[in-house]
Structures are given as C-alpha cells and as structure tokens.
C-alpha cells in the first residue's frame, strides 16, 4: 500500500519525505487555509506557487483541488493546475459537473482524484468517468455513526469485479487503525495526516523495551 501525506504544510511534508516512505501528497482548500498566514492577501498565484513548492519536495502524485463548481470552470482551472508540474493531480468533487470535468481530463491525459466520496455509487461513477484516483472519506462517515471502512471494502470489491484501474485513496484518516484497516481492505493508498504518520510507529511495549534496553546498556558501559 502506498502512503500519501494529507497536508499542505511544507515542514510536515519535508519531515515525512525524510522517512523515505512517502509516495505522494494530497491537499485541499481547507488544508491550504491552515497554513496561510495572511488569508486576505493570499492569491491564486500564491496557491500555485505553494503547489509547485510541494512538487519540488516529493516526486510523486500531488493532488491540488479545483475551487469552482461548474464543469467548464473546473476544466479551465484544472488545466491551469496541471500545467504547474507533471506530478500534479487535479482533484474534482464527485458531482454531475465534476464527473463531466473528470471525463474531460481523462480524455486529455490529465490525472484526476475524485474527492468527497461517501457512497459506492459515487465511486462507481468516478471510475466510469475515468478518474485516476477515488478518495472515500472514512473519518467523516465514522463521525456520523456510519462504517467508513465498509465503504472502502465495497469500492475495492466493485473495482475488482469489473477491472477498473482507478486507485482507491483512503482519506479522512483519523488514527493508525484506519491505516491498518485500509491495508486489510485492499486499498491502494492511504493519505495520512503527519500526526497519524508519527503515531504509526509508536507502541507502548516498544517504548518500554527501549527504556529497559537503554538502562541495561548503561550498566554494561559502566562495567
């Protein structure tokens, strides 16, 4: 399973990349807003420069989301985003207009990430439209007492049934168990916040074992 980081924070991206485990990056308008010091003066050109900076750090798919709702506007903005760098993937919502845009991008060889997916039918339509990736948001489903991981399992099964090449990116990951469950479900990718990436390596028995080993090592050095 591939690991993407779900952030627009350059320091977090650099830190994750240094681990040697990072395959790509996903961003969205909310993540961009978190890192903007002066939102009133943050322009679309600033946004493009920020995406370009991410592309310089990670040699892999970098998802950048359109901020319009009509297909023609999505296409215009998406083509502009795709021109930033060959690794840019255009994120489009799975709406009727978004599906039109995804189909257009597919025909032009521009990679897409169908986002805000909450049902198997949305994922099926995204694959039919030619999406490169589809992003089910499991944490947000869990928030409303719905089994988010069951959706991932359904999408994987549907894609396997018909041989769709659309890759499943498990998004809205809240904790390490989501990552493990995504791997067990056969998802292609998990896009993970930096905090959760750091949690993946932690275990209390590992910490206890290290403490004991260091204590014993200290004794050996003194003897």
Swiss-Prot record:
GO terms for biological process: carbohydrate metabolic process; pentose-phosphate shunt. SUPFAM superfamilies: Aldolase. Keywords: Cytoplasm, Pentose shunt, Schiff base, Transferase. The active site is at 91 (schiff-base intermediate with substrate). Its EC number is 2.2.1.2. Pathway: Carbohydrate degradation; pentose phosphate pathway; D-glyceraldehyde 3-phosphate and beta-D-fructose 6-phosphate from D-ribose 5-phosphate and D-xylulose 5-phosphate (non-oxidative stage): step 2/3. It catalyses: D-sedoheptulose 7-phosphate + D-glyceraldehyde 3-phosphate = D-erythrose 4-phosphate + beta-D-fructose 6-phosphate. Pfam families: TAL_FSA. It comes from the Bacteria. GO terms for molecular function: aldehyde-lyase activity; transaldolase activity. Its main location: cytoplasm. One of its GO terms (cellular component) is cytoplasm. It is found in: Cytoplasm. Transaldolase is important for the balance of metabolites in the pentose-phosphate pathway. HAMAP family: Transaldolase_3b. Belongs to the transaldolase family. Type 3B subfamily. This is Probable transaldolase. The lineage of its organism: Bacteria, Pseudomonadati, Chlorobiota, Chlorobiia, Chlorobiales.
